[in-house]
Amino acid sequence: MRDPAFPGAAMAYHPFHAPRPADFPMSAFLAAAQPSFFPALTLPPAALGKPLSDPSLAGAAEAGLHVSALGHHHQAAHLRSLKSLEPEEEVEDDPKVTLEAKELWDQFHKLGTEMVITKSGRRMFPPFKVRVSGLDKKAKYILLMDIVAADDCRYKFHNSRWMVAGKADPEMPKRMYIHPDSPATGEQWMAKPVAFHKLKLTNNISDKHGFTILNSMHKYQPRFHIVRANDILKLPYSTFRTYVFPETDFIAVTAYQNDKITQLKIDNNPFAKGFRDTGNGRREKRKQLSLPSLRMYEEQCKADRDGAESDASSCDPAPGRDSLHSPLSTEPSPLRLHRSNREEKFGADSDQELDRREVRTARSHSPVGHRSPPSSPRLEDRGKDKNTPEKKSESPESRKDGGDNVFSRSLEKDKGESRRKEDSKSDPECGSLSKETFAPLMVQTDSPPHLSASHLQSLALSGLHGQQFFNPLNAAQPLFIHPGQFTMGPGAFSAMGMGHLLASMTGASALDNGSLSSVQGATGAATFPFHLSQHMLASQGIPMPAFGGLFPYPYTYMAAAAAAASAMPATSAATTMPRNPFLSSTRPRLRFNPYQIPVGIPPSTNLLTTGLSASLNPGSESSKPGSSRESSPIPDTPGHKRSHSNSLSPKASMKDSINELQNIQRLVSGLESQREVSPGRETPK
C-alpha cells in the first residue's frame, strides 16, 4: 500500500499490523478512548504513544483495552478479528491536490492569518477549498480534514506583530471533519472543488456539536486527507493520504487583533457586515428607513396645525392612547415635538419602534372619521401614558375622548363601534366620565366543564358607573380575572351577605335564576366553586380580607360584578350561539363593563353588545328557548318593574315576572338560612 504523501515525524501515525503500517490507531475511533463524533472523529493524545509491534496485540487495540492489562498474549485470540474490515484491493491512483483561492490565502498569510473562535462556533474565512485530481473514477473515496497545533507556543499581538508569549496550553483531542458527501466516487470528487466551508471552530471544551475545539492565541495548521474506502467504518484500517498547505496556517483569536486582517476580511467576505461603517447593518437600515417616514410625519403634523378642526384621531399614534394633540387647540403638544426631535436625532432604537412609526404614518392618511383598530399592545400604551406629564394639561373634552378610546378597545370586535361611540359622546349620563378617566371593569370567566352553554351566557352591568361602589374605578388598569380563577354560583353571594345588594341595585332588579337553581336541585349540592386568587386581587388594587372571604365591608366595585353574576339570565344556546362568533365555543364567557351604550343596536350584534345596553334584561327559562333576549329601552327604577315589550306573549311576560319575584325572595331569605354555609358549598333549594 502507498505511503502517505506527508511522511514527516509530526504526523505521528502508527501501525496496527506489523507488516503494513497504517495511518491512525484504532483507539482514535473507539468510545473506550474518547467518544467519537460523526462526521467528526476524535484523535486522543494516546495516538502519540509507542507503536504496537506485535501483530497479536492488534485486536486488543481495537477493543480499547490497555496493552499492559493483558497478562498474556493468548487472550487477544478471543477478540474479534479484523479480517472483515480489510480494505479493498488496491487501485492504482495518484491524487493531486491544489488549493483554491491561493492568492487570497497568500495575502492573509503575509499579514498573519487570524480566525475568530466563539462558543457557538464560527466558520473559517477564507474557507478551506481544494481541487482534487488523479483519483480513480470508479473507486470510492472519503475526504476529510482536521486542524492540528502548528507548534507548542502561545502568542500575543504586540507592537503590530505576533510574538511568542509562552508555552502552549494543553490541547483538546482533535476531531476529524468528514466531508458531508463522503463516500463518493473519484469522478464525483474531481468534478468540482471540494469545500469545507461548513467546518466550525469553537473554544467551548464541552462542545456537543462536533466542532473543532481550539485554544485562543495559538497557531494551528489545517490538514487535508484522502482515504480510499467505501464505508466510514473502514476509516481506522485505511491509508490516509495527507496534504498540508503552509499558507493556510492561522492563529485562533476571540477578537481580531490586526486591523489589516480585519480590513482584508471586510473587503473579501460579503458576510462581514459587522465592521463596516457604511454597511447594511440593522442600525444603518433603521436610520435610512426612518428619514422618509419622519418627513411624512412632520408634514402631517403641519397639516394638523393649519386646520383647526382636524380630528384627534387623524394623527393619533394609537387608538387606545390618550390624545397627545388636543382637538381644541391649534398648537401641537410639546410631547409630540419632543418625540419628533428625538427621533430625528437618534433614529429608531429598535425594530419595534420602526414598525410602530410606519404604522402611525400609514394611519395618518386615513379618513378623519375613521378610527383604526389598535396596533400596539395595551400595556405598552398604558406605560407610555404613565410617563407623559403633559397628559394632565388636556382639556376635559380630550380626556373624555381618551375614555372613549379605552372603551372602544374593550369592544373592538363589534361592527357598529364608531356609531355607538359618537352616540355615547352625546349621552348625558357620560358626563361623569369627564371628571376622571375610568378604566373599564372587565371580568371574563369560563364556566366549569360540567355546565352547559345555556347556564352562563351573558351578563350586563348597565349604568353602574354612577353607583356608589364604582367610585374607586379611577385606577389606571382594568380588572382582568383569569377564567380558571373565578367561577361563581348564585348562592355563593347570598351566603356572603350580599342579597340586599341585589335587591336594591339599579339595573339589576330583574333576576332570573331558574336554570341555575334547577341545576343545583338536580345535583344535590352546589357545583359552583368560588375561588379567586388572593395575589390576583391584590395586584389589581382590590382589598382582600385576611380571613379568606372574597369581599370586605363596605362593598367595592367587585361586589357589584359578583352580585350581578347571581342575576345572570338563563338563555338558550340554540338561539344565541350560531349568530354569535364570540360565543361560538361551548365555554360561555362573562364580561362586565361599567360604560353605557345606546339601545339602538341591530339584532345581529353579539351578546356582549346586547348585554351592555341601558338595563339588564331577564332571559327566559331554559324550557323556553324561543323567548326574546332583546333589552328594553326603558331604564329601571328600584321601585318599579319594567315592562317586557318584546316578549313573545303576555303570558310569558307574566311568568317571567313571577319567576323574578320568587328568585329575589329566595335570595333575600337565603341571607339568614345560609350564613353558616361556606361560599364553595351551598345546599340546594
Curated annotation (Swiss-Prot):
Pfam family for this entry, one: T-box
Family annotation (InterPro entries): p53-like_TF_DNA-bd_sf, T-box_DNA-bd, T-box_sf, TBX2/3_TAD, TBX2_3_RD, TF_Brachyury, TF_T-box, TF_T-box_CS
Location of the protein in the cell: Nucleus
Residues forming coiled coils: 652-676
Location of the region described as Disordered in the Swiss-Prot/TrEMBL record: 270-433, 606-660
Keyword annotations: Coiled coil, DNA-binding, Nucleus, Transcription, Transcription regulation
GO annotation, biological process: gastrulation with mouth forming second; positive regulation of DNA-templated transcription
GO molecular function: DNA-binding transcription factor activity; RNA polymerase II cis-regulatory region sequence-specific DNA binding
SMART domains referenced in this protein's UniProt entry, alphabetically: TBOX (SM00425)
Function noted in UniProt: Transcription factor which acts as a transcriptional repressor. May also function as a transcriptional activator. Binds to the palindromic T site 5'-TTCACACCTAGGTGTGAA-3' DNA sequence, or a half-site, which are present in the regulatory region of several genes.
Protein name (database record): T-box transcription factor TBX2
